[in-house]
């Protein structure tokens, strides 16, 4: 069971993420061993490394979706585990690598054309429609709009986690993204990103290199 006192203490959490002597592994492959760092509030921390080095796996571990092999992860001194992670995720805003998953946020909400009960009956009887085409890929401007909107909606979140947020952005939009992330850090938040973009890596306060020898 999750300690009920944890929910109370979350209101007092600053947001610092600490990783100590961590072993990160997936599918029997060790991606990092003895990994230690602190992602402090008010700073931009960037996890970088080649494709397949474990950046996304590390982020998922820090969010409590994956167990840590050894060592520990804590948030302002409170131990983060798979069991306690749900409480901690309430104070996190997450931008996934596949940001297209949030594309519905760009679409206006449409009113239903029939009552929910009626829809349920007919939906069970009628043959399912076949989707013949996939949605068009989002343009860089639309992706940036999603990132901007997600960050704007995260005013009450103390920790910002973003997985390759600039992957599909133009250099100009990447620069604007950097300013957005900086604004979040300047507001006293913990900002943790995974990125291979030189601009983001160079302007991070702390850079964590992921490779087989980490």
Question: Which positions does each model-derived feature cover?
Answer:
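Conserved structural motif at the start of ABC-family nucleotide-binding domains
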Residues: 17, 32-34
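The feature captures the beta-strand-to-loop junction immediately N-terminal to the Walker
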Residues: 48-50
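Helix-to-loop junction immediately C-terminal to a conserved catalytic motif
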Residues: 63
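Conserved ABC transporter NBD signature motif
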Residues: 71-79, 88
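Q-loop/switch helix immediately C-terminal to the Walker
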Residues: 98-129
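Walker B catalytic motif
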Residues: 162-165
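Conserved H-loop
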Residues: 197-202
């Amino acid at each position: 069971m999750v300690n009920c006192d944890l929910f109370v203490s979350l209101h007092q959490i600053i947001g610092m993420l600490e990783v100590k002597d961590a072993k990160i592994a997936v599918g029997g492959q060790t991606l990092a061993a003895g990994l230690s760092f602190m992602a402090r509030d008010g700073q931009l921390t960037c996890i970088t490394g080649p494709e397949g080095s474990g950046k996304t796996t590390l982020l998922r571990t820090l969010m409590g979706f994956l167990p840590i092999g050894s060592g520990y992860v804590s948030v302002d001194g409170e131990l983060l585990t798979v069991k306690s992670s749900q409480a901690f995720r309430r104070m996190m805003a997450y931008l996934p690598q596949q940001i297209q998953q949030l594309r519905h946020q760009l679409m206006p909400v449409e009113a239903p054309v029939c009552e929910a009960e009626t829809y349920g009956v007919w939906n069970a009887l009628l043959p399912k429609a076949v989707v013949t085409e996939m949605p068009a890929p989002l343009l860089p401007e639309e992706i940036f709009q999603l990132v901007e909107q997600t960050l704007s909606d995260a005013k009450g979140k103390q920790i910002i986690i973003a997985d390759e947020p600039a992957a599909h952005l133009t250099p100009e939009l990447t620069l604007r993204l950097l300013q957005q992330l900086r604004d979040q850090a300047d507001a006293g938040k913990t900002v943790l990103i995974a990125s291979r973009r030189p601009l983001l890596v160079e302007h991070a306060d702390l850079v964590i290199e992921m490779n087989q020898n980490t």
